[in-house]
Regions:
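Active-site-surrounding "flap" and adjacent substrate/cofactor-binding loops of secreted or lumenal enzymes
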Residues: 2-12
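A conserved amphipathic helix/loop scaffold
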Residues: 16-18
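Extended surface/linker regions that mediate inter-domain or inter-protein docking
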Residues: 21-191
Length: 191
């Protein structure tokens, strides 16, 4: 998350939804969410924003934990309306969903559809699979937790996210005459 990529208003003004108060702010060049107890005004937790997702309609914010997992946080910035919105108001679900019902691990969920060339990169898969074989349960059970070394070819939804690598298409369409010919004849581009 950089000043060039962050679109949200991190001005320290608290935002309260579903009985939870979050204070988005900047400090020492970084971006943070403080989770505040609305009854006592005491800070419960601080999450550093390390990655952004989205730049057109709304922007989501991710923090990272020691195991390499990126976590999608509960509040997003609505770019057109210039306001904070809770994730429960954006994703379909019951009105009584818990505050954190749309918080997610980006490495295993969001990465697959919202990026080009995703590799979730569970770095300790052998350990996890051996634990499962012996009856252990990962993620909060008796077994080891997932550790991530995720990568993508390109962050965000690009042509290749749905259509696959586009090198042949790009190479053939460098020639503007070919593009005009296809446009004016109405012929489909086979690449």
């Amino acid at each position: 998350a950089t000043p060039e990529s962050v679109r949200g208003q991190f001005d320290g003004q608290p935002v309260t939804y579903w009985g939870v108060t979050i204070r988005p702010y900047r400090s020492d060049g970084g971006y943070f969410f403080d989770y505040i107890d609305p009854q006592t005004d005491r800070r419960l937790e601080t999450r550093e924003i390390v990655r952004t997702v989205g730049s057109r309609r709304y922007q989501q914010y991710l923090s990272r934990t020691d195991d390499g997992a990126y976590h999608r946080l509960e509040m997003l910035w609505h770019i057109e309306d210039q306001r904070w919105v809770h994730m429960n108001g954006v994703f379909l679900g019951h009105d009584d969903n818990p505050f954190d019902s749309n918080a997610a691990v980006w490495n295993t969920g969001c990465i697959m559809c919202h990026n080009t060339g995703p590799v979730p990169g569970v770095s300790n898969w052998e350990q996890i699979s051996q634990g499962i074989i012996s009856g252990e349960t990962p993620m909060g059970g008796a077994g080891p937790a997932f550790e991530y070394e995720s990568s993508v070819v390109e962050l965000g939804i690009a042509c290749g996210s749905c259509h696959g690598p586009g090198s042949v298409h790009a190479k053939r369409n460098r020639n503007p005459f070919r593009r005009y010919l296809l446009h004016f004849t109405g012929d489909p581009d086979p690449t």
